[in-house]
Amino acid sequence: MKNILSWMLMFAVALPILGCDNNGGSQTSAMGKDMVEDSVLTDNQKLSRTFGHLLARQLSSTEDFTLDLTEVIKGMQSEIEGKSAPLTDSEYETQMALVQKASFEKKCSENLASAEKFLKENKDKEGVIELEPNKLQYRIVKEGTGRVLTGKPNALLHYTGSFINGKVFDTSEKNKDPILLPLTKVISGFSQGMQGMREGEVRVLYIHPDLAYGTSGQLPPNSLLIFEVKLIEANDDNVSVAE
């Protein structure tokens, strides 16, 4: 949805310059004219047509809802010609808000169902330990041999966060160096899931949205989050010596 609104803003900026080319020639339109071979397009025509490609790609790839690209083009043409839009600005904003709200609620419901289904199936897999029923699970990938993390200290670690589909949304690996995190400042599922880790251990956390960002934040609403975490070092004041 945010992508759509951003591109709508770009429409408003671009419309005044779409009516003619830089040489003052006649308006170039995709409607009612034969396609011009790319090899004979002017620089302005190439720029204009590429803008159209980018716009169509952006609008057709959104996961929220699909706009009718034909009507979008007609709307642009009508605006250039000085014709009225079918909705007033106020009506448009109201209708867009309703569409956005419905899309958000649908995504919340779908993601929550996917998260709960995943956790229900995942808990029976080999090596998976459930810390909180249907909310928080972990699996040890590599055993650690160092001190045990207890309480809620700072922790020097590497992490990679991904969604159920495997898409990575954040990682400390991009900076190569491990990151020092205050575990009192992160989502509760992350800090709870790390308790008991030994230095050197690699653990995968499976976190229900209730223990993550829920319906707020920059990530898709009600996303189940999966973190692979390697504990490098725990704060000396909050560790116990491994037996």
Curated annotation (Swiss-Prot):
<comment type="similarity">
    <text>Belongs to the FKBP-type PPIase family.</text>
</comment>
<dbReference type="InterPro" id="IPR046357">
    <property type="entry name" value="PPIase_dom_sf"/>
</dbReference>
<comment type="function">
    <text>PPIases accelerate the folding of proteins.</text>
</comment>
<feature type="signal peptide">
    <location>
        <begin position="1"/>
        <end position="14"/>
    </location>
</feature>
<dbReference type="GO" id="GO:0006457">
    <property type="term" value="P:protein folding"/>
</dbReference>
<dbReference type="InterPro" id="IPR000774">
    <property type="entry name" value="PPIase_FKBP_N"/>
</dbReference>
<keyword id="KW-0472">Membrane</keyword>
<keyword id="KW-0413">Isomerase</keyword>
<dbReference type="Pfam" id="PF01346">
    <property type="entry name" value="FKBP_N"/>
</dbReference>
<feature type="domain" description="PPIase FKBP-type">
    <location>
        <begin position="152"/>
        <end position="235"/>
    </location>
</feature>
<dbReference type="Pfam" id="PF00254">
    <property type="entry name" value="FKBP_C"/>
</dbReference>
<dbReference type="InterPro" id="IPR001179">
    <property type="entry name" value="PPIase_FKBP_dom"/>
</dbReference>
<keyword id="KW-0697">Rotamase</keyword>
<protein>
    <recommendedName>
        <fullName>Peptidyl-prolyl cis-trans isomerase Mip</fullName>
        <ecNumber>5.2.1.8</ecNumber>
    </recommendedName>
</protein>
<keyword id="KW-0732">Signal</keyword>
<dbReference type="GO" id="GO:0009279">
    <property type="term" value="C:cell outer membrane"/>
</dbReference>
<keyword id="KW-0998">Cell outer membrane</keyword>
<dbReference type="GO" id="GO:0003755">
    <property type="term" value="F:peptidyl-prolyl cis-trans isomerase activity"/>
</dbReference>
<dbReference type="InterPro" id="IPR036944">
    <property type="entry name" value="PPIase_FKBP_N_sf"/>
</dbReference>
